[in-house]
Amino acid sequence: MKDRFELVSKYQPQGDQPQAIEKLVKGIQEGRKHQTLMGATGTGKTFTVSNLIKEVNKPTLVIAHNKTLAGQLYSEFKEFFPNNAVEYFVSYYDYYQPEAYVPQTDTFIEKDASINDEIDKLRHSATSSLFERRDVIIIASVSCIYGLGSPEEYREMVVSLRPEMEIERNELLRKLVDIQYARNDIDFQRGTFRVRGDVVEIFPASRDEHCIRVEFFGDEIERIREVDALTGEILGDRDHVAIFPASHFVTRAEKMEKAILNIEQELEERLKVMHENGKLLEAQRLEQRTRYDLEMMREMGFCSGIENYSRHLTLRPPGSTPYTLLDYFPDDFMIVVDESHVTIPQVRGMFNGDQARKQVLVDHGFRLPSALDNRPLRFEEFEKHMHNIVYVSATPGPYEIEHTPEMIEQIIRPTGLLDPLIDVRPIEGQIDDLIGEIQARIERNERVLVTTLTKKMSEDLTDYLKEIGIKVNYLHSEIKTLERIEIIRDLRLGKHDVLIGINLLREGLDIPEVSLVAILDADKEGFLRSERSLIQTIGRAARNAEGRVIMYADKITNSMEIAINETKRRREQQERFNEIHGITPQTINKEIRDVIRATQAAEDKEEYKTKAAPKLAKMTKKERQKVVEQMEHEMKEAARALDFERAAELRDLLLELKAEG
């Protein structure tokens, strides 16, 4: 069993990183439950966390607050740990409409979902890695606190095969069917097996290219080989192979029988209550739906929406904590919460939203009350899994502050860059003043970010600046991911000099060319002008040696004062460090291709945008088809190379091209 983390990097910890790594490692060794790494923008927090993982050598769960960020972290950790198991566990739905009922209009919305096969494969790869080795890092979104099948059941139902093992061919086939593998001799894909005489080929649920060939001689396994599923090329012999279930909700036959009896009993009790309350229509609906599901479970071993019966399948009492990915980890694992000021409130809010929707379904006869137990964890249940947890944020939230009296700071950037200087100027005449500042930046070939409070103000300001000949663009929430990347790219290339937006805090806006961030109406207290938002926004100018922030305000609010003082404190510390070590701040030199680290498709996508999209209208049907086919091929190649962000970019672009065509 491989159990050591091996960090591969041409860099050594620099600046503040060595002391941060040392303190974090010491905290874990001393058994500290909560620690917070308060790292300023651009100080290399991911590298610090990678060093921590290497030193403490524990299986690690890294939680991010959205798929894009999770994908970005996955790419980074994969680079740092190429010889260890770096896995990706996010929701496998490309599109998900949960089942819901609107009583006012008597409208039932069926569950509708499009499952991403690639992500499903990665989820299986993540859970199977946890049972096979200890050097595992799983990058997950909040989907890791949602219900999953029992880890004990999942582990017990693994089919373990070795050469010279005595097992009848038909018994192996039965075992594979029990763990949700389907026999398919024609369309051989993930989660299926095929039989050719004495040879059984199994396509594991956690793979997408290699399958396992088991060769029998009578009732004995003669040889086990790993084979390329597409070409049939033999890749090598195996001494042992473990086939993990094709579903996380697998149940042994005897448990399934017991679960069916329990579901029937709950159904009878529920129908009795409904009849007593005169809910005849709801009772009929519930009976019809549940009996159909039970029939499917008896005959097939599963049914659509089987997760709603997960409490019965795992034989847990009502109200008990569901199994989640966290239960698949060994007891001594470590949790890292990235951008914790956003992620922790997200984890906290999941349970209530889920219960509100399901309660309506239960009340109107679409589900049994036990469906309420198929849910995300309550926050206090999540807390029980915290043995060693590290929160990572430039602006920790109240929960982290409360639980970690002493913050571990990482303020010094390896590049020597300082936090920007801040000017506060009056609101009167702010636009004329801003135009003067923009002109000065344009002359030096630098860029400007402007953040406003309302959509209308953003639009009006954009129009006004365009009228006076400034190259400006406007970033708002309705812009698709693809266009967003293109706008940021154009800003870096100099097609625009100014970018205006309301919320410029979203990931991917760390642009080295930006030397000025202007905050309009900085004294209007609220979500976008809170101390946290202000510090994060100020950080956008910290990638440039000339970085400066101008706040337009008539009074200095409490949030402004905290943000200004914190930035000043950090800057003084950084200047002191640079002076002692003789460092001259250097603007980060980042390839334009790398606009958003999570989406390395920017380069290729730009090519398609310029070559394919404008000419699409003039193309013949055949030519258009050729472009689409080429992109589909590239998308699959990217997915195969585990470059999911690029694959997602190409997929979105494909959809746009198909819609236009």
Curated annotation (Swiss-Prot):
SUPFAM superfamilies assigned: C-terminal UvrC-binding domain of UvrB, P-loop containing nucleoside triphosphate hydrolases
User: Its principal location?
Assistant: cytoplasm
User: Quick one: which residues bind ATP?
Assistant: G39, A40, T41, G42, T43, G44, K45, T46
Give the motif span (Beta-hairpin). Answer: 92-115
Q: Which Gene3D superfamilies match?
A: P-loop containing nucleotide triphosphate hydrolases, UVR domain
Q: Which GO terms describe its cellular component?
A: cytoplasm; excinuclease repair complex
Any idea where the Helicase ATP-binding domain is?
26-181
Q: Does the keyword S-adenosyl-L-methionine apply?
A: no
Annotated coiled-coil positions are none
The cellular location(s) given in this protein's UniProt record come to: Cytoplasm
Query: Which UniProt keywords are given for this protein, alphabetically ordered?
Result: ATP-binding, Cytoplasm, DNA damage, DNA excision, DNA repair, Excision nuclease, Helicase, Hydrolase, Nucleotide-binding, SOS response
Positions of the UVR domain = 625-660
* InterPro entries reported in the protein's UniProt record: Helicase/UvrB_N, Helicase_ATP-bd, Helicase_C-like, P-loop_NTPase, UVR_dom, UVR_dom_sf, UvrB, UvrB_inter
Q: Which GO terms describe its biological process?
A: nucleotide-excision repair; SOS response
**The keyword Nucleotide-binding appears for this protein:** yes
Domain named Helicase C-terminal is located at 430-596
GO MF term set:
ATP binding; ATP hydrolysis activity; DNA binding; excinuclease ABC activity; helicase activity
Function summary:
The UvrABC repair system catalyzes the recognition and processing of DNA lesions. A damage recognition complex composed of 2 UvrA and 2 UvrB subunits scans DNA for abnormalities. Upon binding of the UvrA(2)B(2) complex to a putative damaged site, the DNA wraps around one UvrB monomer. DNA wrap is dependent on ATP binding by UvrB and probably causes local melting of the DNA helix, facilitating insertion of UvrB beta-hairpin between the DNA strands. Then UvrB probes one DNA strand for the presence of a lesion.
- Family membership: Belongs to the UvrB family.
User: What does UniProt say about this protein's domains?
Assistant: The beta-hairpin motif is involved in DNA binding.
Q: What does the subunit comment say?
A: Forms a heterotetramer with UvrA during the search for lesions. Interacts with UvrC in an incision complex.
Name this protein carries in UniProt: UvrABC system protein B
Originating species: Bacillus velezensis (strain DSM 23117 / BGSC 10A6 / LMG 26770 / FZB42)
